[in-house]
Regions:
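HIT superfamily nucleotide-processing domains
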Residues: 1-133
Length: 133
């Protein structure tokens, strides 16, 4: 009996479990834990852009995935491979989410990699972009 081919969801289609996510139709994870899959981003904004994808859609798995991205970034800093990193998540179409399964973006940063490195304040057009702490 032939095995049933998984149905992968397209951008903006509801995803019921991580196995339906488009990431598995394109690639295999580069790392995996009990809670998280890690993929290279297919459309990276910089070299080293990774996606930390929780295996379940709940706060415990999402939190563990965030923690893994944070630890990964700190290891890269300690190794001298990067100077800093951004870790973030777009939740909901209005926030820029296209794959409707939670996933955390890890973006490595280097000194002077951007004229204006910005931060979260630059994400919203009506924000006060002059305020720095």
């Amino acid at each position: 009996m032939p095995s049933k081919k998984p149905i992968y969801k397209k951008p903006y289609e509801p995803v019921n479990n991580v196995d339906e996510s488009v990431w598995f139709s394109n690639d295999q994870p580069i790392m995996e834990t009990d809670f998280t899959f890690v993929f290279n981003d297919r459309y990276p904004c910089v070299q080293g852009h990774k996606l930390f994808i929780p295996k379940e859609n709940n706060s415990h798995f999402v939190g563990r995935s965030y923690g893994m991205a944070y630890d990964y970034g700190n290891q890269k800093i300690k190794a001298g491979e990067i100077d800093g990193f951004n870790v973030g998540m777009n939740m909901g179409e209005c926030a820029g989410q296209t794959i409707l399964w939670p996933h955390i973006h890890f973006i490595p940063r280097h000194r002077n990699d951007s004229k204006e490195p910005g931060g979260i304040r630059l994400a919203h057009p009506s924000g006060d972009h002059k305020q720095h702490y």
